[in-house]
């Protein structure tokens, strides 16, 4: 095996060594967080499922299709609820007010038209939980997105 000549080390060799060490440190950091926070993350996942299931329907739903997803160390819930008919803006507004009585706070409401389709959205928060509800005109469904903004979320994982 050839020894490294540290006095005549080329620039790209040095960059490669530094990048390799940085990647190793990052992998050790994420791996340690993964191992240490496992129980906390599983508990958070279960809390999010329970919180999503406690969100009532604005009108009677036919189908509730949701899933728990993971991005690195963060879990989030996304779901679609299908209704018997199209949900109106007034019903979505009433639904937001109904969630206010359950401790949720409305952060933002907005309506936009994209490709001649109108969509209405409500962003809510309750403690560390954040939820977005979207509905489109002409469709008999709403999409829900729920995430917990805790210290792991703040770290960017």
Task: Name every feature range the model reports, one short phrase each.
Residues 2-157:
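An acidic-aromatic pocket/loop used at catalytic or ligand-binding sites
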């Amino acid at each position: 095996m050839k020894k490294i000549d540290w006095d005549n080390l080329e620039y790209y060799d040095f960059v490669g060594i530094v990048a390799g060490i940085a990647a190793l440190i990052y992998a050790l950091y994420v791996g340690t967080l993964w191992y240490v926070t496992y129980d906390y993350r599983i508990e958070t996942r279960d809390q999010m499922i329970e919180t999503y299931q406690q969100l009532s329907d604005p009108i009677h739903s036919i189908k509730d299709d949701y899933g728990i997803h993971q991005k690195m160390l963060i879990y989030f819930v996304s779901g679609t609820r299908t209704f018997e008919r199209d949900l109106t803006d007034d019903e979505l507004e009433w639904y937001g007010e109904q969630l206010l009585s359950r401790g949720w706070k409305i952060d933002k409401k907005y309506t936009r038209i994209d490709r001649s389709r109108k969509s209405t959205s409500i962003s809510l928060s309750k403690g560390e939980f954040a939820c977005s509800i979207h509905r489109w005109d002409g469709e008999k469904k709403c999409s829900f997105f729920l995430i917990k903004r805790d210290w792991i979320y703040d770290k960017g994982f």
